[in-house]
Regions:
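FAD-site-proximal beta/loop scaffold in flavoenzymes
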Residues: 2-6, 134-164, 256-259, 264-335
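Beta1-alpha1 glycine-rich phosphate/pyrophosphate-binding loop at the start
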Residues: 2-93, 174-175, 181-224, 470, ...
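C-terminal, flexible cofactor-proximal segment of oxidoreductases
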Residues: 2-5, 12, 332, 341-492
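Rossmann-like dinucleotide-binding core of oxidoreductases
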Residues: 168-224, 231, 242-245, 327-346, ...
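Short glycine-rich anion-binding loops that position phosphate/pyrophosphate groups of nucleotides
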Residues: 25, 122-125, 187, 276-278
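A Rossmann-like FAD-binding core segment of flavoenzymes
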Residues: 84-100, 112, 191-299, 303-305, ...
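FAD-binding core/adjacent interface of flavoenzyme oxidoreductases
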Residues: 2-14, 85-175, 271, 491
Length: 492
């Protein structure tokens, strides 16, 4: 066990477990470790995340459609984890040999040492797969959902005063690239949202609104039962008049335009929901990875060359006993978190870790208001019943009855009224000025501040190096503090 000096609120001579990522896997791993180590005064749990909340990602679709308040689908990490030290920062890199994590946040850079490390950094949208993908919106974070909702409302506002019919139709065309489960669920919620707001615009004809779902494979949602995928396609086409185009190759995304192998679509809203890759931090780690960039771990979720490093969620490829990988679903992340926490506790006590084994309960997806589909324990469900079961399941996953009640109230109002048309700006003049002031202040500090020297006898656990932040790091920190996070999808 390594020693530590008491700095920045850290206690001396404690084994430190550092968890990187504030998603389902990271937060629930910390929660289970709190319970297991509640009588261990020699253990410290530290969770690092760029956001100070746990986002219930399965409910993010309804934030975008306005059926759910954004605050009601997120849980403050500090309130949820009372015995864990929370650090709001962005993970820049991990040094596996020195066992330290490089962090950046709040206009300063520092190192955080660990004895046990948990990688739960999630995944990010693979923008490298399509040229020009920077011209498309993404859907991974709370900021993405609010930005997308505002973007669609703004397109309707512009279309309402547009006199050119062709330009109006282009503004009202929504294209989603990616026909997997996420793309289809988002497609269903957005069509319901547009149906709700369209009557408010007197100079917009519903027939001018066009929905296009592009999928490279032979069918949409290849990860689920073909019968359920066909049901989803029929519902979307019948209810919304959507165009579902399979076996379609996207060549390039231009501003307001999608170039296909067989033509071009002009669109006011383009969303990239195809392809995810592990975070850039994971990509830079010198460990064995599979062809998709996932860390290769053993059955106990440990890295092969570094048994003190554990991974779960979207970071690793965890193989089931039959030889197939477990799907990257929230239910698996929750179960992985429980097993991983138990294995770390075993490691601290000199016991052998246990392999992760879990039988998938099933998969469910929403198609918008009153429609859903799923397969639960091998039984197919669809329609209103599936919609109700899906909502009930995710409602009960939300910690605390206070937030559950707020969600139920939101859902009740959404059933009885049309979506709200308020267009929320994601930036402001005041935020821009504040960001500029922070950048200038950080730069001045970096010119005047001397590098803090640590004691020769200080342990490697000392949180280091307030050595003066370079301007590039200050810019990243300022952008994170003053605006929404870009849609990288990582949880760091």
């Amino acid at each position: 066990m390594a020693e530590t000096t008491q700095t920045a609120g850290l206690s001396p001579r404690r084994t430190r477990i550092v968890i990187l990522g504030g998603g389902f896997g990271g937060v629930y791993a910390a929660r289970h470790l709190e319970n297991l180590c509640r009588r261990r005064q020699d253990v410290e749990i530290v969770l690092v995340s760029r956001d100070n909340y746990l986002l219930m990602t399965p409910l993010l679709f309804e934030v975008c459609s306005g059926a759910l308040d954004s605050f009601h689908c997120s849980v403050p990490i500090r309130a949820f984890l009372r015995a864990t030290r929370f650090v709001e920062a962005t993970v820049q890199s991990v040094d596996l040999e020195r066992r330290v994590v490089q962090l950046a946040g709040h206009a300063e850079s520092r190192e955080l040492a660990y004895d046990q490390l948990v990688l739960a950094l999630g995944a990010m949208t693979n923008r490298a797969m399509i040229p020009g993908s920077e011209n498309a919106l993404t859907f991974k974070t709370l900021g993405d959902a609010l930005l997308l909702r505002t973007h669609i409302i703004e397109r309707f506002e512009r279309a309402d005063i547009e006199s050119d019919p062709e330009r109006k139709r282009a503004l009202l065309t929504l294209v989603i690239i990616g026909g997997g489960l996420v793309g289809v669920e988002l497609f269903g919620e957005l069509t319901a949202f547009v149906d709700g707001i369209a009557p408010y615009y007197k100079h917009v004809n519903r027939d001018d609104v066009r929905f296009v779902l592009l999928q490279g494979a032979e069918r949409i949602m290849p990860e689920i039962d073909p019968h359920l995928a066909d049901y989803g396609a029929r519902v979307l086409e019948r209810r919304t008049g959507a165009e579902i185009r399979t076996k379609t190759v996207v060549r390039e995304i231009e501003p307001g335009k999608v170039q296909l192998s067989d033509g071009t679509i002009e669109a006011g809203t383009i969303i990239l929901a195809a392809g995810i890759v592990p975070s850039s931090v994971v990509a830079a780690l010198p460990v064995t990875k599979d062809i998709r960039g996932h860390i290769v771990v053993n059955a106990t979720m440990q890295c092969q060359a570094h048994p003190e490093v554990w991974a779960l969620g979207d970071c690793p490829q965890i193989m089931a006993p039959g030889g197939n990988p477990y799907p990257n679903l929230a239910q698996h992340a929750l179960r992985e978190a429980k097993t991983l926490a138990k294995n770390i506790f075993f490691a601290l006590n000199g016991r052998a870790p246990e392999p992760f084994v879990y039988n998938t309960l099933g998969m469910m997806g929403s198609l918008g208001h009153g429609r859903a589909f799923g397969q639960l324990l091998g039984v197919r469900v669809r329609g209103v019943v599936a919609w109700f079961v899906r909502r009930t399941y995710y409602l009960m996953q939300m910690p605390g009855w206070g937030r559950r009640l707020r969600i139920m109230i939101d859902w009740a109002f959404a059933l009885l009224s049309r979506p709200d048309l308020v267009k929320i700006s994601v930036d402001s003049e005041a935020a821009s000025l504040l960001r500029k002031a922070k950048l200038e202040g950080a730069f001045a500090k970096s010119q005047n501040e001397q590098t803090t020297q640590t004691d020769g006898g200080a342990d490697r656990h000392e949180e280091v190096s307030r050595s003066g932040m370079r301007l590039g790091n200050a810019q990243r920190a300022g952008a994170t503090q003053a605006g929404f996070h870009p849609g990288t999808g990582g949880e760091s």
